[in-house]
């Protein structure tokens, strides 16, 4: 356990940030999962809507520093590519 006052405060803020980041990452996984389920079902309209929502969440997570902007771009590109394959 930390003895320095600033470090005790830092432990608390780190814990809050960790919980917030965990929640955001969970939302991202859910959004990407919904895209993949729409793709496997072959429903292009639902997949396009899900990609839009997932892209928005990925961009927001990247802007908040939860994930790196390149990782967000890679994930957006990958799911968009999969949706484009749907006939």
From Swiss-Prot:
SUPFAM superfamilies for the chain: Ribosomal protein S20 (SSF46992)
Q: Where is this region: Disordered?
A: 1-22
* UniProt-listed InterPro entries: Ribosomal_bS20, Ribosomal_bS20_sf
Q: Which residues form a coiled coil?
A: none
**Which GO cellular component terms, listed alphabetically, does the Swiss-Prot or TrEMBL entry include?**
cytosol; small ribosomal subunit
Keywords for this protein: Ribonucleoprotein, Ribosomal protein, RNA-binding, rRNA-binding
Q: Name one Pfam family in it.
A: Ribosomal_S20p
Annotated GO MF terms: small ribosomal subunit rRNA binding; structural constituent of ribosome
Kindly state a single biological-process term from the GO annotations of this entry. Answer: translation
What is the documented function of this protein? Binds directly to 16S ribosomal RNA.
Q: Name the protein family.
A: Belongs to the bacterial ribosomal protein bS20 family.
NCBIfam families from the xrefs?
S20
Q: What is the recorded name of this protein? A: Small ribosomal subunit protein bS20
Look up and give the organism this protein is from.
Clavibacter michiganensis subsp. michiganensis (strain NCPPB 382)
For this protein's source organism, the top of the classification is: Bacteria, Bacillati, Actinomycetota, Actinomycetes, Micrococcales
Protein encoded by which gene:
rpsT
